[in-house]
């Protein structure tokens, strides 16, 4: 078995801490929830082998998918195998958590970076890109008040920030043989196998 490394792209504002050079130091890239690449290549590069998304997100165009080099689409919506395989207490996993768990369970992935995993904090901006760049299929989230005009989450997320934090720390402790990196606006403590960037 040859070892692999993967950078998993979330969409939180902490993406601003990232660089293309950091992303390019990983063998593979997984995009979660259809992040915006155009105009942000200096932060997140311009490639993704995996496209993890639920059915509410507008798919990348064929041209975008080819340009990014997407080879695998993984549906994270309800009733899918990836969602049914996940179990960790009462945590309702986001697409990013499902992607992380997918690679966590594969022994060949020994180096995993989580970029933009800001844990859906209430009254914090949710995405690194501008409101006008947001997927038009999800404008209802502004219309119903889930997000305010600044793109901040106004409600307690169904994904539950504290449960995500506990899950991630449990996995960092359980998989001591893997090296983890995290870019997050949430306060994580470094561990022997976790570098907080």
Question: Where would I find each of the regions flagged by the language model?
Answer:
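Metal-ion/cofactor- or nucleotide/acyl-coenzyme-handling active-site neighborhoods
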Residues: 1-197
